[in-house]
Amino acid sequence: MTIWVDADACPNVIKEILYRAAERMQLPLILVANQALRVPPSRFIRTLRVAAGFDVADNEIVRQCEAGDLVITADIPLAAEVLEKGAAALNPRGERYSDATIRERLTMRDFMDTLRASGVQTGGPNTLSPRDRQHFAAELDKWWLENQRKK
């Protein structure tokens, strides 16, 4: 089991939760980004720097993740791809994507892209709240416990 992070867009507060979790769970945590990242010294935490470019980090995560891994991303197409490989996907707000919900999320994303392309101002996501952070940490623990039972 490995935790993969789409790190270019992952909020720092979520990365901090992940650093602590990697130590506590003693699981590999790999942050994939197209820029250099500073991470705490740990035998469980490492970075993987990829070339700049559209979806380069996403493609690397899809290539390397395996069934049973967890991918942290707000990128819905990336979440869909890792679900197809048997990995789990969790966004920084603590929403765990599933086969049952990912199609709806992809449809909504495509709809919002169409609105933006036609000039409609759709705005961005709300700021990450303390409740979002708690929900993320709880879902991360839930994933870990589920996978501990499978061993």
Curated annotation (Swiss-Prot):
Looking up Pfam families in the UniProt record yields: DUF188 (PF02639)
The record's listing under InterPro entries reads: UPF0178
Report the family membership: Belongs to the UPF0178 family.
Q: What is this protein called?
A: UPF0178 protein YaiI
What species is given as this protein's source?
Salmonella paratyphi B (strain ATCC BAA-1250 / SPB7)
Task: Show the taxonomic lineage.
Answer: Bacteria, Pseudomonadati, Pseudomonadota, Gammaproteobacteria, Enterobacterales
